[in-house]
């Protein structure tokens, strides 16, 4: 036994929650994860196969941080005295915060952030430019190029060979409809897991 207590529940909407109390920790950490990563570009929905451009999970990660009024959730977390971030991997996308106060408010804000999203042509176009610049920065890193070059040689023609952020070309192909469809599929509570430590 490692002496840890873990509380688990699954809500009626399907969201799974794990709580790991740490009495000797001053800071609280919350992370919500959806089972949607960069390899999820070919999806079967109601027997119908759909193909999406590489980088869509990462693009959606960026857009989830913007509320319906175009305001940045990062600033809302700062207002609560917490830090927040997000990341996309091959198999998941996660959003997180760390704080020393206002824990219920931070959890509520995290849940609010991943429960609704708003897209406009202008905001998607702006984000597309930001992500394309980000891709350029990644490609300037020798370690990054070596890692994804190895994956491309090991798994040619598969989503594992694609950059998690996509390519400049694939990002240009992502539409508002693509983003909305993937949000509706993967940001449902039944596809998500909340962990609070």
Per-range role (PLM):
Residues 1-72, 180-197:
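His/Glu-rich zincin catalytic helix
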